[in-house]
Amino acid sequence: MRVVVAGGGTAGHIEPALAVAEALRDKHGATVSALGTARGLETTLVPDRGFELHLIEPVPVPRKPNMDLLKLPFRVAKALGQARKALKDTDAQAVIGFGGYVSAPAYMAAKSLGLPFFVHEANARAGMANKLGVKLGGVGLNAVAGSGMEGDVVGIPIRAVLSGARDESAADRARDTWGLDKDRQTIFVTGGSQGSVSINKAVEQAVDQLVEAGFQVLHAVGKKNELPAAKPGYHPVPFIDDMQAAYTVADLIVCRSGAMTVAEVTAAGVPAIYVPLPHGNGEQALNAQAVIKAGAARQIDDADFTAQTLIDATLDILLHPSTHQSMSDAAKTSTAGNASTVIADMIAATIKSQHN
């Protein structure tokens, strides 16, 4: 059984692809390869997880008419040729895409080669590449209802290791790695792989009061941002590859509300303060609404996110054990069954039905 997954650029597109890839490999013995671009995180994440990566040209679709729009047909043609070659080289029997720059060429290549293909939309508002995939005949799979893309609701695929009981031995190892104090509650802050200027600024201004209140801060500032000086109770790092370890030590997470992030944080059972990215098609403002309504998280809009609003929300959660516990409980009960296995089973069944 040979499957190609397509999802590149950001972790939000790559992680669900890898979660399904692992389920296909581990449960069905499938040989799985990935499509990606040379400029995305997949260049490290995919090989690190044991999968072969095939690179194609990214095909970003301009949101406004400009010169890049005139180049789009040529970019699509080149990427389509590269995607077709990758599918032929791997002798793929099925394809699944997760949005992002590589998905549209993957869908078109699968269509042109007569391969079954699947389209997973993690966000509350579907992107253009995935809508195109379904229109081309792909099987639509939504994380939530009402995304604007046709298809069944299956949830978001996450790694199996992210769900389940907290591993205290793993937490101890993670604390040792980052120099964290076991006796202090930990606030984990991340703005994603590239970081967030607004989140970083507020955290750096708030950190002294947070530490004075008895907490410690693990702060992933982003690979391209200047690393602040560490000080007692404040542990800045450029980027964290092992998010599972960070979730394990976190008592509270402050982060953007990408669909994959929300799914992972919720599965980990950690209370969160979400700061939606105020760009794109507005999907981040919608992604966390279900868990917020369930009581598992709070939301502060980017325009309102300051040192003071961060301090106020953090103290309200961490200084009141009953509040913190109720949020954690709500997160655990909000987690649906892992979609990775469901999707892997669908792909495997489709391949088997075509070869019987």
Swiss-Prot record:
It is found in: Cell membrane. Keywords: Cell cycle, Cell division, Cell membrane, Cell shape, Cell wall biogenesis/degradation, Glycosyltransferase, Membrane, Peptidoglycan synthesis, Transferase. It is a peripheral membrane protein. One of its GO terms (molecular function) is undecaprenyldiphospho-muramoylpentapeptide beta-N-acetylglucosaminyltransferase activity. It is an enzyme of class 2 (transferase). The keyword Glycosyltransferase applies. Gene3D superfamilies: Glycogen Phosphorylase B. Its main location: membrane. UDP-N-acetyl-alpha-D-glucosamine binds at residues 10-12, 123, 159, 193, 240, 284. GO terms for biological process: carbohydrate metabolic process; cell division; cell wall organization; lipid glycosylation; peptidoglycan biosynthetic process; regulation of cell shape. InterPro entries: GlcNAc_MurG, Glyco_trans_28_C, GlycoTrans_28_N. It catalyses: di-trans,octa-cis-undecaprenyl diphospho-N-acetyl-alpha-D-muramoyl-L-alanyl-D-glutamyl-meso-2,6-diaminopimeloyl-D-alanyl-D-alanine + UDP-N-acetyl-alpha-D-glucosamine = di-trans,octa-cis-undecaprenyl diphospho-[N-acetyl-alpha-D-glucosaminyl-(1->4)]-N-acetyl-alpha-D-muramoyl-L-alanyl-D-glutamyl-meso-2,6-diaminopimeloyl-D-alanyl-D-alanine + UDP + H(+). GO terms for cellular component: plasma membrane. Pathway: Cell wall biogenesis; peptidoglycan biosynthesis. Its EC number is 2.4.1.227. It comes from the Bacteria. Cell wall formation. Catalyzes the transfer of a GlcNAc subunit on undecaprenyl-pyrophosphoryl-MurNAc-pentapeptide (lipid intermediate I) to form undecaprenyl-pyrophosphoryl-MurNAc-(pentapeptide)GlcNAc (lipid intermediate II). Belongs to the glycosyltransferase 28 family. MurG subfamily. This is UDP-N-acetylglucosamine--N-acetylmuramyl-(pentapeptide) pyrophosphoryl-undecaprenol N-acetylglucosamine transferase. The gene is murG.
